[in-house]
């Protein structure tokens, strides 16, 4: 029986599928799998199930001389050297559609949390308490009637747009390509990035990461935004220059931010932790039972297809 190496614990539903077709070796240590352990694990493996936090570089790929597939448990895949994997004739797959609803839900949740100061209010209620209702106390912003600007109208961005429309928000979007059919379906308007930044009350990043997207939102972009704007990032941390974000918040160039991902993840810039107008969550975009189970099944089926000589779903290289 061929071996699959699983770089961390995954939901039981996918693990059971793998056990029906493979000898399964899974990393069960504390924290993330280290490079030496990963290299040892893939040496005699036909398939690797990597996590979004698993760094699959050239050394790891070279060690996996029998690898046919690297099935990444996550929608992103910038943790894998996909070009080198292609050179070695190794398929790399991801789990794109499983994350759509969960990440869109979280994105809108972050919009509401930062605009209505929900987390800040929770902390106040648990610590010092409050004196009671008052007309000027703890005011935030409504989302109804506001404009949301979505960077990246893919599956997740489109799901965010549909939810935003349910809140009676106007929807702007930007990206490398205009999507006229989705515009008609959702009621969204395509604009360039600068126009979006200047006009949106809430800016959500829902685009995939690539090197061209690095620091897409930097000092210059923050200066374009409304002073009452909010930035929400549930995509990839390096799209936003975190130090520039800190300065924009401290200088009141924007009103607030909500982040589920970080430039130096898992580390979080200390200044962000000290600001009351920032909501921080620990990369939980697709952390629902439903999404994680679906992702588990997708990576398992991809690995099974590859060793059976079939083309797996969601190949990215």
UniProtKB/Swiss-Prot annotation:
Pfam families: 2-Hacid_dh (PF00389), 2-Hacid_dh_C (PF02826)
Molecular-function GO term, any one: NAD binding
Keyword terms: NAD, Oxidoreductase
Binding-site residues for NAD(+), renumbered to this chain: 155-156, 234-236, 260, 283-286
Active site, renumbered: 236, 265, 283
Species classification: Bacteria, Bacillati, Bacillota, Bacilli, Bacillales
Species name: Staphylococcus aureus (strain MRSA252)
EC number annotated for this UniProt entry: 1.1.1.-
The name this protein goes by in its record: Putative 2-hydroxyacid dehydrogenase SAR2389
Family in the record: Belongs to the D-isomer specific 2-hydroxyacid dehydrogenase family.
